[in-house]
Amino acid sequence: AHSPRCPSTDEDLRALFNGSWLDVEERQRAAVRQAVGRRLMVLTGGPGTGKTTTVLRMLLALSREHAAVTGCMPQLRIAAPTGKAAQRLAESLRQGAERLNRGAHPIGSDWMPHMHAVLAADAATVHRLLGSRGRHGGYAFHAGEPLPADIVVVDEASMLDLGLLRALLGALREDAVLVLVGDADQLTS
């Protein structure tokens, strides 16, 4: 489903992929291009296929798009089924950002506010993101009290059970962007 957002320009994509030489990056470029203007993106791939690099560039493009449309920097959230997985994604994004900034063709300074927004994103379990009430049941964020997030990335999405995924989808604002990341060959919960 497309949202009423401005499309990312080819110039923006060239800036994000400046100096690229790997064939695999054409698929990454296509994934980033497809994410812009959509409310839901599913990114799959096995270990070492560049999912984290793609997510970083996708978040930068989505952040830039959000700022262009709203005039505000987005509220970004990073989550995973486990705290360890969420922290691993946050650390991988930090390492990817360092590589983007120190390569032969670092991204331009106009991308830095978006880079800072991505790196400042809170990493949490999906339960914590939703404000789990523990043994009392339910979540603080739901359809009546939506999650204060413009862009949400969930890593290892195949490990989410259907109840938790339903709660997450129900807690998102109508204009929020959800990026589900995972390995199609990973065992589901």
Stretches with model-predicted labels:
Residues 1-189:
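Conserved ATP-binding/catalytic motifs of P-loop helicase motor domains
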